[in-house]
Curated annotation (Swiss-Prot):
Gene3D superfamilies assigned to the protein according to its UniProt record, in alphabetical order: Arfaptin homology (AH) domain/BAR domain (1.20.1270.60), Phox-like domain (3.30.1520.10)
Membrane topology according to the record: Peripheral membrane protein
Coiled coil stretches, renumbered: 588-652
Record text about domains: The PX domain binds phosphatidylinositol 3-phosphate which is necessary for peripheral membrane localization of ATG20 to the perivacuolar punctate structures.
One GO cellular component term: cytosol
Pfam families, A to Z: PX
Record lineage: Eukaryota, Fungi, Dikarya, Ascomycota, Saccharomycotina
Listed Polar residues bias regions: 55-67, 532-545
Organism: Vanderwaltozyma polyspora (strain ATCC 22028 / DSM 70294 / BCRC 21397 / CBS 2163 / NBRC 10782 / NRRL Y-8283 / UCD 57-17)
Protein name, per record: Autophagy-related protein 20
Length: 667
């Protein structure tokens, strides 16, 4: 038998059952003796069960036999705990694992590290069993495996905890996504504007509130809310091609600018594309002109929201869901209370084009050019214009201008005139129908002639009805989509204009940087001339004159994007500035200020150049390519519908007049 030092401090050898029962306990402990005497009666009552346990333990190895003996010692002869066997074992397992945690056996750790993955998985899934087995082998073989069991249990616990944390993180992420992005079914649903209610604000003011239905929820918004939404999107996504919204027009002057003040078109029973105006109801008393304006806005605003819900980049932010959330009753209050929207720069040209919410200090200090800076001039071509020629943006700009002109001044304009002409022809046919009916009633004696006149009256009346249906289809399903395409081309033009203004911004920085460098060079020359004698002063003055001319030339070059008036004004301003700045100033202080300004301009120039490259790449390779593909599909659909409507009208009209001819031949 091995020398076993028990937890009471004695080091006697365990030889037989008597030594186990008597000699293991430390001498001189009266309480322990009392406990042993009190436990003798209990041990005698359970003698049969102990003998059965010993017989079963003898079948196993000697190590297992020793462990069983020691378990019986702990269960029967422990003087400190008055508990049953099972509760004592669990308490013993916890205390042993806690006490021996600091004792580490390198060989045991090495074996544990080289163990199979299956054993680790079993340990992680059943930590209680591993602890019990570890304690049994520890009491028998020297106490090394109990550390292994506790370590395995800790590793299994850590693994389970890590899995639990991962599951918790996944659950939190899923909840965050669900709080930001609604159900997938809602994303696939299309927006519909079901009602348009005329609401009075008091003092003779009124506005139209549009009831938007999306999935199972509905919210009411007015036109100014859509306008505010688009302005925020332009700041958040400056490089995206945003769909247009209808122009800001009053209820009085809209009809004059679209189709005349007296036109009233029949609403078609079939809708095309994503907008079906039949589903929209206008509540309240409105005139014909107001009805056209409201239906025009319903179509444009519905298409606006549906296109936003199809944009993957915009869907990454919750702004569209916030707009459609019925809990946000007042949209302006929601925008004003948001810290993200309030921190955005006022000008898009001072935003970070890739992430406007992460605008740096350098972006906020960039100059903001006006539209007058991009006016054409006959002066020298600047560096940014050569960049545009290399990138091909000058050709792209001309092509989109031509495309917008063909749509607006060509297809859309002439089709609107045709619609108005057909609308006038419709009223002429109704007048002819009334005239023939009047003649038929006047021919009382001529029954045959009266019957023919009645047929003609009915024919013109039916033709007027068919033409009225055609005019309604052309107006709502052809002219309105064409007008939307024209405004979409205007959005592409705005995107190209944004890129061009960023180029002008870079040009301003380059010219300002060159001007500051020349001013610094001039001051350095003046500072080097001052301590010298008068013989070199004349040469230095000549150099000064040449150096003075360079900033003026650069200033004239910097104003190459302006007109003649701006050039002269800039020259006068530069002369006044030089007389003020360079009169009785400390050259050293001025040079220090110029050096700081040059460093800031260098940083701004690098940022502006990098932004221009990113914007050019995104617009040219992604935005305009998608724009061309989408416009091609829309125009194909419009032309197919156009030919279908004209074909159906011609077929109905032909059948009508064939029937009139047949009746006349029968007479």
């Amino acid at each position: 038998m091995k020398q076993k030092k028990n937890r009471f401090g004695s080091g006697k050898r365990i030889t037989d059952q008597s030594s186990v029962d008597g000699d293991l306990i430390a001498p001189g402990n009266s309480s322990m003796d009392k406990r042993r005497n009190s436990s003798s009666s209990r041990s005698s009552s359970t003698q049969e069960s102990k003998e059965l346990t010993e017989s079963l333990a003898s079948v196993h190895t000697s190590d297992m036999h020793q462990s069983n003996i020691h378990e019986r010692i702990d269960g029967d002869d422990n003087p400190f705990l008055d508990q049953d066997d099972e509760s004592f074992k669990s308490t013993r397992a916890n205390t042993s694992a806690t006490k021996l945690t600091d004792v580490v056996n390198p060989n045991a750790e090495y074996k544990d590290n080289d163990s199979d993955n299956d054993e680790e998985i079993l340990t992680a899934t059943a930590p209680d069993t591993s602890i019990t087995e570890g304690i049994v082998s520890t009491e028998a073989d020297g106490g090394n495996d109990v550390v292994t069991a506790s370590v395995e249990d800790k590793e299994g616990t850590v693994t389970d905890t890590a899995v639990g944390l991962d599951n918790a993180n996944n659950t939190v992420d899923q909840k965050v996504k669900e709080s930001i992005i609604p159900d997938i079914k809602l994303i696939n649903d299309r927006v519909q504007i079901l009602e348009a209610n005329k609401v009075s604000e008091g003092q003779g003011r009124a506005y139209v509130a549009y009831t938007i239905k999306w999935g199972d929820q509905s919210v009411r918004r007015r036109y100014s809310d859509f306008e505010s939404l688009r302005s925020v999107l332009m700041k958040l996504f400056p490089t995206s091609l945003l769909p247009p919204i209808p122009e800001k027009q009053t209820l009085k002057n809209y009809s004059k600018s679209i189709a005349g003040s007296k036109s009233n078109y029949l609403l078609p029973s079939e809708g095309t594309g994503s907008v079906d105006l039949v589903l929209s109801v206008i509540n309240g008393t409105v005139t014909n002109n107001d009805e056209k304006l409201i239906r025009h806005r319903i179509r444009m605003l519905t298409s606006f929201l549906n296109k936003l819900l199809q944009d993957e980049e915009i869907l990454k932010t919750p702004i569209i869901y916030d707009f459609l959330d019925p809990n946000n009753i007042n949209w302006n209050d929601f925008i004003n209370s948001s810290a993200t929207f309030s921190m955005l720069p006022k000008s898009v040209l001072q935003c970070n084009p890739l992430d406007p919410t992460n605008t740096t200090r350098i972006h906020a200090c960039l100059p903001v050019p006006s539209t007058s800076h991009i006016l054409p001039s006959k002066e020298k071509v600047s560096d940014t214009k050569t960049i545009e020629r290399k990138d091909g943006f000058d050709i792209i700009e001309q092509e989109h201008k031509q495309y917008e002109s063909l749509l607006k001044s060509g297809f859309y304009k002439h089709n609107t005139q045709i619609t108005k002409s057909l609308y006038g022809m419709q009223h002429d046919m109704k007048d002819l129908s009334d005239t023939f009916a009047h003649f038929a009633s006047a021919q009382a004696c001529e029954a045959e002639l009266a019957e023919q006149l009645t047929y003609m009256s009915n024919a013109y009346d039916d033709a007027a009805s068919n033409l009225e249906a055609l005019v309604g289809l052309l107006y709502y399903n052809i002219n309105e989509p064409l007008g939307e395409s024209v405004r979409m081309a205007g959005s592409a033009k705005e995107l190209i204009k944004y890129r061009k203004l960023k180029g002008v911004q870079l040009e301003i920085l380059i010219n300002s940087l060159e001007s500051k460098r020349q001013q610094l060079h001039k001051l350095e020359l003046q500072r080097g001339v001052q301590p010298r004698n008068g013989n070199t002063a004349s040469g230095a003055s000549g150099n000064d004159e040449s150096s003075v001319k360079k900033p003026q030339a650069s200033k004239s070059q910097s104003s190459s994007y302006g007109g003649k008036f701006l050039n002269r004004f800039n020259k006068i301003a530069a002369m006044v500035k030089e007389t003020i700045n360079y009169q009785e100033q400390d050259p050293q202080t001025t040079m220090a200020n110029l050096i700081k300004e040059i460093e800031q301009l260098n940083e701004s120039e690098q940022v502006a150049r990098h932004d221009l490259e990113d914007i050019s790449k995104i617009i040219k390779e992604d935005r305009l390519t998608k724009f061309s593909e989408e416009r091609e599909k829309e125009l194909n659909e419009i032309l197919r519908n156009y030919s279908k409507y004209l074909k159906d009208y011609a077929k109905k009209n032909l059948e009508l007049w064939k029937e009139i001819k047949t009746r006349q031949e029968q007479l």
